[in-house]
Structure formats: C-alpha cells, structure tokens
Amino acid sequence: MFIMIKKSELAKAIIVTGALVFSIPTLAEVTLSETTVSSIKSEATVSSTKKALPATPSDCIADSKITAVALSDTRDNGPFSIRTKRISRQSAKGFGGGTIHYPTNASGCGLLGAIAVVPGYVSYENSIKWWGPRLASWGFVVITINTNSIYDDPDSRAAQLNAALDNMIADDTVGSMIDPKRLGAIGWSMGGGGALKLATERSTVRAIMPLAPYHDKSYGEVKTPTLVIACEDDRIAETKKYANAFYKNAIGPKMKVEVNNGSHFCPSYRFNEILLSKPGIAWMQRYINNDTRFDKFLCANENYSKSPRISAYDYKDCP
C-alpha cells in the first residue's frame, strides 16, 4: 500500500482547474440532452433466438487493413461503418445514460466484444466519447456514458461500468451482436479507478484501460490485461503515486504509455487522440479478441520509447 491523497483534496484540485476542463470542447458538456432516440436496427444484428459464434480474427478484419496509419486515423475510418443509439438518463438502469456505438457491417465477425467507457470526477461523457466511434469502427460495440452524479467515487463508477455493460447485452438493437464473455472497460481519472475495481469483480472483463487513474486503494492483484495511460505532469492524480503504482502492482499482462508533459487531462485532449488511438485499439483487439496480429503495435518496435510525445513506455509481455 502506498500513500494516497484524500478524496477531498482530489476534488479541490479538479474544481480549481475547472476552467481548463470546460475550455476544451471535448472535455465536458454542461447540459445533457434527455431526448430518447428511437432504436435503430443494426444491419449486422444476428437473430436473438440463435446467436452467431465468434469468428476467427482473419474472418473479421483483413490483414491489409491492420496498419499503424489506420489505427491512428481519428476520422473513425476503421474497417467498419458505424451507427449510434442514444440511451437517455431516464431509460438507463444503474448509470446516467449515454451513447451506444456499433458497427453495421461486421456480420463476418460473428459475436463482437463490448466495451464500456466512463468519464472522471466532475466530468461528462463528452470527455471520453471519442473512444466510442474509434473502437466501434474496429469491430467493437461500445457504450460511452454519463455517471449518475459527476461527484461519484471510483467504486460507484465501477458499478456504473458494470451496469452499462449489462445494458448493452440486454439492448434490443445490439444485444444479440455481443459475446457476453468478451468485455472491456475504459475509464478516466476516478473512472480509471472504477475500471481497475471492475476488473477484480467481473471475470468476463478481458481488458481494461485506466486513463490517468485515481483510486484510494492499491489494486495490486489485478490479473486482467491492463493498459495504463499516464500523464507525466499530472498534479491531480500524481503519476508516481497512482498510475505508476497501479501498473507496478498489476500481475497480469500490462503496458504503460506516459504522455510527455501531459496534465491530468491528457487523455481527453484532441491532439492526443492520434497518439493514444493506436495502442488503445491494439490492446483491446489483442486481449478481448485474442488477435495476435495486433502485437506488433504494442511493442517497442513501434517506437513508443523513442517518440518525443511519450516520456515513458513499458510493455511487460512484449513478444
């Protein structure tokens, strides 16, 4: 166990920097539309009475599509077309509503992996929403969510990630597309702490990505494959106390990428989407789908350790 700052201190630090949060378009949305959007039937939806079996990776995405340039393309130009379905706050069960992003032409993939993404303390869905279309365009069903309260702690965010995954599995549009045994979770700040906690509680979560994570527990027994995104100059959830400690104590497959000169908000800045998209997609493909073709985008031969944008890099199980 290592020394932690008190939650009240974290709250104070974030509130002080609140102007920065709301000055960047993708970090937060002050108001949340409560309009319920009608269900859109997916062209790739498999019969709910008889689900398809998972396909082999090569059946899903051709080798020629898997390139470093494609993985870093932030225009959502993965191998699949995507649609979205809005989940209103009123209809959501156990979380604050959100958006489901899903591929429409992935019938060759069989059942798909599903990923839930949660924002951090005093933040909204918009701060992490870019992960939705990026991952969906690579063959995942993804839900980006708002929390019940922007002040919810990490344990509450873990419960809401869990509820969001259940919501997708039961959804009448995308539920029959999902393999409930191939799940993932992504969270920023306290949401990252929530992803760590969820990984210790739900065995069907095969991969997580804590972004500048904070939790007042060490979580040293995380066996789930974990990609930690750290921010070098994080003064809210200091990297040495949190991200580095979580990474050091994890005992499963693990990788860390630290953004050079990054503040606590580095995972939400638009100009870091290209930097983080490639390892993020590759990690989820490798460990949710067991697609070893993505190994080459996780290792040092992709020059993570030499990039001026990255101040620290480590991959425990680099082949």
UniProtKB/Swiss-Prot annotation:
GO terms for molecular function: metal ion binding; triacylglycerol lipase activity. The keyword Lipid metabolism applies. It comes from the Bacteria. InterPro entries: AB_hydrolase_fold, FrsA_esterase, PET_hydrolase/cutinase-like. Its EC number is 3.1.1.3. One of its GO terms (biological process) is lipid catabolic process. It catalyses: a triacylglycerol + H2O = a diacylglycerol + a fatty acid + H(+). Keywords: Calcium, Hydrolase, Lipid degradation, Lipid metabolism, Metal-binding. It is an enzyme of class 3 (hydrolase). The active site is at S189 (nucleophile). Active at temperatures close to 0 degree Celsius. Ca(2+) binds at D314, D317. This is Lipase 1. The lineage of its organism: Bacteria, Pseudomonadati, Pseudomonadota, Gammaproteobacteria, Moraxellales.
